[in-house]
Amino acid sequence: MNRRACRLALAAGLLTMSMAAQALSFEICDRPKDPGADQRDVMLRFGALVREELVASGQDVVLIARSGLDLRRLDVRYSHEAVALKDNDDKPWSVRELYYSCEDHQPRVFDEGLSGFLMGTDDPATSYISLVFLPPDRAAPLRATAVDKHHALGVLGASYSANAYPFSTRHQNCNQWVMELLADAWGAPGAGPDAGARPRAQAWMRAQGYLPTVFTASAHPMTWLADLVPWLANDDHPPDEVAHNRYNVSMPSAIETFVQAKAAGATRVELCHAGRHVVIHAGWTDIAPGCVEQPGDKVIELERD
């Protein structure tokens, strides 16, 4: 299947005029670049370390985010949020996520192996992974909701937009699907996966004070890019915000901030690699840019065959 897993990072890049021309040349359905043998070896070894962290947690559901495009100019590290599940889809660990189906021209819920998820990056030389471990009272309902395909599909939107507005059901992106899945699990655990699932989830998000990431454009690229790029839209954002070049978008950092505030006892581990240099950092602060270790971080140098 020619697919490209949820390129929300594309939308972020489009939100600055200086990057618009470059972003327009990017195709969402392009296949990711195949890593070379050495990079593939690094990613597989790095994936083994991620898997070790998942196993060591003793949990069966974990929020997982990965880096994508280089968005340092926007102060964004993570672009894609998903749910890692133990013993699901006949795999020790798999990742349930939303992706945009290029063949069907609509979003789908997709189960992917952990290795495949980790390799879905545009920079295999340097990548970051964030893992959020939930307390039992928060993990159990999320697990039950995530593995139930009726619930997982109940909060799946019919139309994909990379810059979807979080408080509208007109469109949806990959991170928004995860946020609505959380809302469905935590806000209405006994509710059925009916047509009201998404409005109910968004009402709970708003009531709980969920704050999406705000991007401010220096000009008006989105007003015309939305007419040219089929996976971008303006019609779900409040007109006054569009007029002021403000776009509220669900990003992994916003989801993690919400979880940290609402799930007492949640913990976080971040991993990165720059070549064969790996840093593992525990806590809600980020690893220093460039995958540079700080006091207290664990450092591993990956071996070569």
Residue ranges, per PLM feature:
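Bacterial N-terminal signal peptides that target proteins for export
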Residues: 1-10
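N-terminal signal peptide c-region/cleavage motif recognized by signal peptidases
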Residues: 18-20
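Cysteine-nucleophile amide-bond enzymes
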Residues: 22-305
